[in-house]
């Protein structure tokens, strides 16, 4: 068996925090590469191993009380691992598994950052896209709206990072036959796109 396929889940205390962080990074990178090559089984295995290491680093800690930079970084690794697995499950149509991971990731981010942070907006956007895939339009709209509000508050009304939400929100509105609202979203996205291009 390849060393990278051997059991990697050893307690943080026995291996040392630094070694676990190095292993987490290596596993995450292997998973990304497998994902890009559409080797989803391998990607899932690596992402799961990375998640277990990240969980080990946060054992007996609480995100809301993560005062030290090291503790916050450990929880940030955990949120990344959860989001990575959620995105993979989402792509594969494993929606219930994806939602569980996205929800857990969102809960951690709310504890870490509060409810008005750009990192929270990332998760809300991801959850909105998932709700669309599940045809839960009302839930998706609430999530898109909140994600957009947070980004507008922090970035202004003409920032490039608004475009992905506007695009996906418009696609949803088209699907539920709210074409006038969808067109307004599309036109706003186009205006921002033009402003961004002109600023380069």
Regions found by a protein language model. Name each.
Residues 1-200:
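Intrinsic-disorder-linked linear interaction elements in eukaryotic regulatory proteins
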């Amino acid at each position: 068996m390849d060393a990278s396929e051997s059991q990697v889940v050893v307690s943080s205390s026995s291996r040392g925090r630094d070694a676990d962080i190095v292993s987490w990074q290596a596993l995450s990178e292997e998973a990304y590469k497998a994902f890009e090559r559409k080797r989803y089984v391998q990607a899932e295995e690596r992402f799961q191993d990375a998640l277990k290491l990240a969980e080990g680093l946060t054992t007996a800690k609480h995100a809301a009380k993560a005062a030290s930079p090291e503790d916050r970084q450990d929880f940030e690794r955990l949120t990344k691992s959860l989001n990575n697995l959620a995105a993979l499950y989402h792509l594969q149509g494993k929606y219930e598994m994806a939602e569980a991971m996205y929800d857990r990731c969102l809960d951690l981010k709310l504890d870490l950052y509060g409810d008005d942070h750009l990192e929270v907006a990332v998760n809300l956007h991801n959850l909105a896209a998932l709700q669309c895939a599940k045809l839960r339009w009302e839930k998706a709209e609430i999530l898109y709206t909140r994600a957009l509000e947070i980004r507008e508050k922090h970035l202004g009304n003409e920032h490039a990072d608004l475009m992905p939400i506007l695009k996906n929100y418009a696609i949803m509105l088209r699907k539920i036959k709210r074409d006038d609202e969808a067109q307004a979203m599309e036109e706003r996205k186009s205006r921002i796109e033009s402003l961004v291009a002109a600023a380069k």
